[in-house]
């Protein structure tokens, strides 16, 4: 869980990017060639006047549209839909901006309504201005968003708001129609979407100076209740968050990891806490309490960034009065504050990165759902891939009004993120909805349940009053008093309990009546009894409580009352309770008579009204005090900006406390006056009330006596059954005694002896099992230790085997090279032999022919013929010598090939011996434990690097000395005690020495300057080893090795190069 700071919603809202001033950058951008689509920025030159206008606060201006934020270019007209304009025109021709008619062609052809999509720009923040960001997107009129660098790229929406637009203007366009539809029984959803630090939370919640969508919607709901005569409303709220795909109840901190369920009306959260609200202040207090438990965190863009999605749900039930009753209408108003999507620019790590991944996953699923809904095809829609889309399934599927508010930043650094938000809004605009009113079955209607209970309780009171005379004479009063005194002795014990039950009944009627909010314009005659004046109080509170800032419904539930009174002065609360108890015996009962309806508000009504006023003021003082604390905490960062707010809050709190003290004084005076001026009619009504209570209690006593008779009959039946069971038990005991007397005592002793012997056997077995358990535990411990050592030895043997395999591979390559070379030499030898054989007959033939020709023509000179013959013999001898030399070379190559074959066979035998050794080590035999870790790494590197053959003899003595030292060091007494492994170890160490000599030769000759990896001999070297700085390994081998193959220095770090 992330840390939850104690700062509330107001401190977080004021630190949002909307509160930053919009100063102009010091320099203006210059035009450049290219376009946005080709990847090069093409900012237009703009002046300070034509760019985003400066303001001291984001909500300081009064413009409602986005057109005032910058001057419009000729040819730019507003539009109402969303569509991406086509290709970029050629540079020589003027840019043909699309018109509003072109952008709404697609939307006008659809039959159903669509999601309402509005765009809200925020100004450049201080950080963006200092960083030199420019305006990349801007509002072109009231319906278009256009790209600064490519004016042909434009999107059309229902409304576009510039940086100077207030939240109230956004609410009037985006949220007010949804709220009105919810009051008429149509479900509604309003949610803000955008990247992090774009102003979503500020738009939805706002602050003290400028409230957001949620406070404005709550205020609008209660104002619509006041303006709707003839209907009764019941309002409930719930507040939840989705943090890391886990649903938490913000109104109940214990409600964690709640589950989503589904019924006929849609999806709902199981176990969510719902609170009945009766005023805007009451609802806002729940929001403030929930914000204290919401997950927030800091990133590069925002100090208090939302780390979870929140859904504030307002459930509205309404029905008409009396004969005009047409059923109960039920609707839900969802006000959603989504967490911002995050990119790599936030540079979050650890928990923040994990939170961001969950946020991006849920928003990606939301985008996928919107995209599939906008296509209009019957495809699978992945609502269940995220908790957010699962809860929004009913809203997104078209069963209510949906309003999407996309908050975007015009900064060029967030150009791509803003473009993605605009494309998401464009897809959402194409989703069709078909909203309809909801009707609720009476059995599931909470307001109807309260009404039925109230009517039943009122019928009971009417039955109690029936037959009583409204006015009585003094004689009748005295008779009644005497009768009461006579019956008081018998009913005293029962009367106290019945008084408590009666008080609970009256308080329930009062509380249920308060929960039903009625308009002040309702002209229907008031109902009788206590519910009439309570409803009158709940309706006319705005006129009576003139000093209270909350000008809506007055009544709060009991839990909220206790919480609000706890923040007031304890002495005042005690005095109020004492006065109410003192006057409650007279004035509370007197208010239920028939004269109350004619005479207006009684003393009890006045005291109740004063008490409720004190409660409301105490709650407002507590809320103002918490807001003042948050502002004081925030003033550390911005003391000048919050000083005025702190002064205003302190002034309001002092005024409310002074007004509360005046009300407490008035309440004390009215209580004393009510006690002193109790009239005779109040006494008569009290007597009639007590008489009715006595008759009621007598009736209940008769009922209980009847119940007692039934219980006595059941008790008698149970007594009969108990007697029968007791008789059975006695018979069984007698049979048991007879059986025990008949059995001899010797049998008992024999059984005892058997039991003792069995017990001894069990004890012996348990001891044996304990001993075996201890033995097995020790063996297990030894086996674990032996297994660890064997694992180390097996790992070392595997390393040796892998290095031997590499050596075999290299030798196979060398054998292949030698065979190829041998083949070439054989071919050359055959060619030379053919030439030699072909020249001798040719010469002889040519000489014979020539002789015959010469004999035929003239006589040859013998001396010349001898000289020619001698020369030919010399050439023949030279060719024979060359042929002999080639044969000698061929024999040498054959010898080398045979040696390589033998060497390969020897290595294969060594490898097989090592695998045999590994197998023996695994079976628990003695291992080669004398080779330490350093020798193993050295031997492994020696085997790996000793693959190239060279004839140089440099550094042989040094290598032999080092190898002999290592060999002496590795020999231990354990080896001498195990002669079975001595031949194998001798062969292995001889092989290591041979590999060492080869490695020394290769380092001394050409491998010292080679750029081939010294381990795999395949890849080029690409890593500089530290601290030895040798450039001798490729990247994979450098990561696998722990020591340098050249100098045996332990590798601390690597520098990977790409050559």
Swiss-Prot record:
Amino acid composition bias (Low complexity), ranges on this chain: 1-35, 43-58, 70-87
CDD domains per the UniProt record, alphabetical: KISc_CENP_E, mRING-HC-C3HC5_CGRF1-like
Taxonomic lineage from the root: Eukaryota, Viridiplantae, Streptophyta, Embryophyta, Tracheophyta
One Pfam family here: zf-C3HC4_3
Family (UniProt): Belongs to the TRAFAC class myosin-kinesin ATPase superfamily. Kinesin family. KIN-7 subfamily.
The protein's name: Kinesin-like protein KIN-7K, chloroplastic
GO MF terms held by the record: ATP binding; ATP hydrolysis activity; microtubule binding; microtubule motor activity; zinc ion binding
Domain Kinesin motor, residue spans: 114-431
Single GO cellular component term: chloroplast
